[in-house]
Amino acid sequence: WFQESRKDPTGPYGDYYVWADDDKQYEDARIIFVDTEASNWTFDPVRKQYYWHRFFSHQPDLNYENLRVQEEILAALRFWLDLGIDGFRLDAVPYLYAEEGTNCENLPASHAFLKRVRAEVDAHYPDTVLLAEANQWPEDVVDYFGDYASGGDECHMAFHFPVMPRIFMAVRRESRYPVSEILAKTPAIPSSCQWGIFLRNHDELTLEMVTDEERDYMYAEYAKDPRMRANIGIRRRLAPLLDNDRNQIELFTALLLSLPGSPILYYGDEIGMGDNIWLGDRDAVRTPMQWTPDRNAGFSSCDPGRLSLPTIMDPVYGYQVTNVEASMSSPSSLLHWTRRMIEIRKQNEAFGLGSYTELPSSNPAVIAFLREYKDDLVLCVHNFSRFAQPTELDLQTFDGRHPVELIGG
């Protein structure tokens, strides 16, 4: 499309992208990839015009004002849905449209198009999930669920980005308050919708939605080496971020599986995979999955030089040591522990469907909360401190009920 658009401005693809004679429009839009892009506009020597891009210059933005572009996107969705996929992660949904005099984020036109997508999905593919990737504050993201009264008419799910850095912050500060405060500020969502919560993903651990002081603190604690940083975040995997500390990894995973929302695990974190900060940009955390100690970590039978990214050769995180095969053969492995925790979550509907109520705790290092759905009531207590901690909880409401330990047997 882009090659045709740049060659023939008056052709069928001429206005599939956003073109301009200069780079002066949309000056209120921030630059997202501050490490690599000096502008949201790039000059094309073929068409001799500038094209608009919110991310890399090799990722020109489609022109959603063009109804033919909308139809093309709907056709692409239908193609994959007809093949039987379960849903879509809708990347960067706040940036579909640009409008002069705005920051070009969260515009009404974006929501209008998402409603159209949702209507198409509901009409012909009713079991499909639309997951919004909107790196914004919860009060802005909640709009991507759509109309509250109707139960939601845009996306079924949306990532909750600000929770992630605050879990890391809470552990280093040994205080529940970073997590408690962001959850308290999270607005209610439509009844048929759900947050998607995560610890890490294929991008950097974003620090956009923290204060400058908090960002400096996170860099000092988790990314002392400048190579560990990218854009406004940290490009490391979960295990290296936590110094491969099994207790901390278990705490983070237990929080992921018990906080409100649907947990989204990043591949390899279940076996404690590492990263490669010598690779460029976001590739540090995108190395091949480590299945076995064999050639290419069992990921591919091709010549190693043909892999899109090299396997990790680190003595601690290298595929010869850290892999699924080795984890499966060890009953005490992180993989088996994670599977047991997921099974516990599945056995208790309160985690997936229940309400969330934080309980007052006498110890700031301890967060305690209830998950409740119908007759299923679960008390979760997490310790952010490095050491064992006492705490007092007021559980008089449950006098006469008998607690059953879910994990310890």
Placement of each model-derived feature along the sequence:
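Active-site and adjacent substrate-binding regions of carbohydrate-active enzymes
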Residues: 1-409
